[in-house]
From Swiss-Prot:
Gene (UniProt): hemL
Keywords: Cytoplasm, Isomerase, Porphyrin biosynthesis, Pyridoxal phosphate
InterPro entries: 4pyrrol_synth_GluAld_NH2Trfase, Aminotrans_3, Aminotrans_3_PPA_site, PyrdxlP-dep_Trfase, PyrdxlP-dep_Trfase_major, PyrdxlP-dep_Trfase_small
Entry protein name: Glutamate-1-semialdehyde 2,1-aminomutase
A GO term for molecular function: pyridoxal phosphate binding
Length: 424
């Protein structure tokens, strides 16, 4: 069966033909590749084509596809049983592994997805502060729970409308939206609203393309939250163990009240978590009145994969230096080739994460990101795919370097960039 036929058949039985919208390739006016298998830095589609994979399952695969250590850990766990709905030693082992490197985090709760982690963190913050409103930032994505599917609408200083059908206005009205990297927009909202339970932010935004928050912005944000008895939530589902071993904390050293984790923490299996100090976490059921539960939360397969992934990352002390150097080489190379061709391009990286925009101006927030030439991006993406490079099929996603990549792979990629730019 070909990719084209596979997608046509999938559309008959699966809504939209995919189980997550961006996979449909609609943003690049194309159709998805159906993947048969992956190995290291590469994926292979059912037509027999191979690609250097910079999506890496949207971030979880720090060690690439089919890592032997993670596979071995999963096989060992599976041999004992895939799920019990009861505590296992693996849960405590992974909890200790995560918490040991974050002095301000004392307890953790595992869930099965980033959406569950952020949704639970919001509920926890509301339960702890006894306040109703939450503040998020334009362009930051925190999963698809109702209260977080809200955009800026008519402005940062107003209540906002849902950005998805099915999300009630009565839910959306409790979500405030500020401008990313703009502390004044945050101050305005706090001046007008005294019942903000929490501020949730991607300290390294990866869902409007890659846009890091500025250090002074985050420091001032933390002060505002503290002064208003508002909890600060860092959504590190994407950046955790990606930007550095300690995520954004390893870079900005800001101690958020709650951190959400995902992707790498599950080693490629469905796992996520939220963590905080004990006085906050202890109001979760069964100790307190904030309810959160999940049939597969902390399942042994995901815990085993997570332990293997984080243990390996922690042992390989030079891993993040290597990944950062490769990401830097890639983004600087792309920028140089774009300049030579006279194309507008902004490119950056943070650790093993990288992003690029087809615009001449620097990007520091969502409105800047929207200035990117989407038609140019679509042409570039198509050309790169034809040259064997698998990039995220959306301008507003982040790319990832994995440990199986090396200078040769980056050189091959940059040659593909050169050829792709020639055809634009």
């Amino acid at each position: 069966m070909t990719n084209k036929k596979a997608f046509k058949e999938a559309c008959k039985f699966i809504a939209g033909g995919v189980n997550s919208p961006v996979r449909a390739f609609a943003n690049v006016q194309s159709e998805p590749k159906f993947i048969s298998h992956g190995k290291g830095a590469y994926i292979f589609d059912i037509d027999g084509n191979s690609y250097i994979d910079y999506v890496q399952s949207w971030g979880p695969l720090l060690f690439g596809h089919c890592d032997k250590d993670i596979q071995k850990a999963c096989q060992k766990a599976l041999h004992k049983g895939s799920s019990f709905g009861a505590p296992t030693l693996l849960e405590t082992e992974l909890a200790k592994l995560v918490l040991s490197d974050f002095p301000h985090l004392e307890k953790i709760r595992f869930v099965s997805s980033g959406t569950e982690a952020t949704m639970s963190a919001i509920r926890l913050a509301r339960g702890f502060t006894k306040k109703d409103k939450i503040l998020k930032f334009e362009g930051c994505y925190h999963g698809h729970s109702d209260s977080l599917l809200v955009s800026a609408g008519s402005g940062a200083a107003t209540f906002n409308s849902p950005s998805s059908l099915g999300v009630l206005e009565d839910v959306a009205k409790h979500t405030l939206v500020a401008k990313y990297n703009d502390i004044n927009s945050v101050k305005e909202l706090f001046e007008k609203n005294k019942d903000i339970a929490c501020v949730i932010i991607e300290p390294i935004a990866g869902n409007m393309g890659l846009v890091p928050a500025k250090q002074d912005f985050l420091e001032e944000l933390a002060k505002i939250c503290k002064n208003n008895q508002t909890l600060l939530i860092f959504d590190e589902v994407m950046s955790g163990y990606r930007a550095s071993y300690l995520g954004s904390y390893g870079i900005n050293h800001i101690q958020a009240d709650i951190i959400t984790f995902g992707k790498v923490i599950g080693g490629g299996l469905p796992a996520a978590a939220f963590a905080s100090r004990a006085e906050i976490m202890d109001i979760l059921s069964p100790l307190g009145g904030v309810y959160q539960a999940g049939t597969l939360s902390g399942n042994p397969l995901a815990m085993a994969a997570g332990i293997a992934s984080l243990t390996k990352a922690k042992k390989k002390t030079k891993l993040y230096d290597k990944l950062g150097k490769l990401a830097k080489k890639l983004t600087q190379g792309m920028k140089k080739l774009a300049d030579e061709k006279g194309l507008p391009l902004q490119a950056c990286h943070v650790g093993s994460m990288f992003g690029y925009f087809f615009t001449k101006d620097p990007v520091s927030n969502y409105q800047d990101a929207l200035k990117s030439d989407l038609a140019l991006f679509s042409k570039f993406h198509k050309n790169m795919l034809e040259n064997g490079i698998y990039l995220a099929p959306s301008q507003f996603e982040t790319g990832f370097i994995c440990s199986k990549m090396d200078d040769k792979i980056i050189d091959t990629t940059l040659e593909a960039v050169r050829e792709s730019f020639k055809r634009i």
